[in-house]
């Protein structure tokens, strides 16, 4: 059975940069870059008959460039570069609190040394500032912790392609400062590959890139915060109305300019921040130059005043109206609208990563088959 499917992968990170210090307070742009952002399009390249759309949020793209071109760092990266012999008590506490920020079943427990440190973190925390206390971490433990935290975030593809990363992953413990530095430097190198990888996706692989307003604002509320009562009648609003449609348009325009500066052309497609749309939002999207937009089925359900009824398997009982494209004619032009299947999206985004790969694929194909039957 041959079916038509649209896959849209949303890549987003909000701004994490502290404007006063110039340092990023969280590491997620860097860590997700080495985990997903390069690996996904490379994996999909192995299946040239399947087309994908990637939504790249401008705030993510700007931060990637900042790391790669300006040498920006986050506080996790800066601390990771420090020799474990020179750590302060506060830094040790920070490491124990934050350097197990990974999904244990797949990113911590499979690596014996990381699992050992994970299990011992509470005792190590109690021993801080108490020389000789049972369970305390020394320089070797902290060096291993910093190295393994950064190493586990690499997608297995990157570890397999890099002999040194592969060796370090197999080594598992007893890391040197030089080995730790290699891991950190390799992260920045992979970050530099993100934008070229997606440029290749559009130029050679037949994929498409879409985008989002510059700083990921909720456009309907930025245009007029009274729009909240359209979705939630009776919602309590500030006494002073808030309406800045000019700013909303500027967010769209600047986002498109950021995109064009990196990829050489403007995006045709828009994934509005958090999927939030309204008639005024669609009009501004058309005015900015977008030709299509995608959002969630719940908005279509509200617009048509029709509930999305599903059977026990999660299959919509009335699929035709949900899986149809829609056309919105606005004073500024036409925008074609597509609405995602919320159930399938949640399976891909939140459930299948916990499943056996074959079982996840079979379940997804079963869902698609049931929908088309």
Feature-to-residue mapping (PLM):
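N-terminal regions that are enriched for targeting/export leaders
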Residues: 1-52, 59-182, 203
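Short, solvent-exposed turn/loop segments enriched in Gly/Ser/Thr/Pro and often Arg
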Residues: 55-60, 213-216, 269-278, 298
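Active-site-adjacent pocket scaffolds in enzyme catalytic domains
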Residues: 31, 273-373
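Acidic, His- and aromatic-enriched active-site or binding-groove loops in soluble protein domains
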Residues: 71-109, 229-249, 286-328
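Conserved, mostly hydrophobic/aromatic
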Residues: 10, 44, 210-212, 270, ...
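Acidic (Asp/Glu)-rich catalytic clusters
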Residues: 1-2, 43-49, 195-211, 226-228, ...
